[in-house]
């Protein structure tokens, strides 16, 4: 089976597992989607491969964290080190999300992978906030702020290596060199 760190891995987008993946349907998500995602995680664990919960839009973050906690709490996955979560640095709650994941890993006595990315769906996040008439945006509106948030998240993750296996994804050469320098 090899080592989970060198074996292939898979990323799963929770919204692909249930059409109504939104907080208003939390009960349905936990009753229908969570068991599907748990089954996939168990299969990944049996193959000793990585299994990442991919990032979603910011308004789905709390729901994703509920699903993540339910899966990580499964006793069958206790000894598996291949569970991962993708966190988008451009989200204004990214730092708190990293803290929450660390606290969860401590509570459950688990080690998890966290992949930090800059973020996706920026245009959609901005448009949705405008359409809803929100007083603020859930994501940083300037690229420079997202870049700084990414580096702050990287620094934070590198300080959590007793519980978190940090992973970094970026297309920006400056960000790559900065993360290497931080490490």
Task: Pin down the residues of each PLM region.
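Positively charged, amphipathic and often flexible ligand-engagement surfaces
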Residues: 1-183
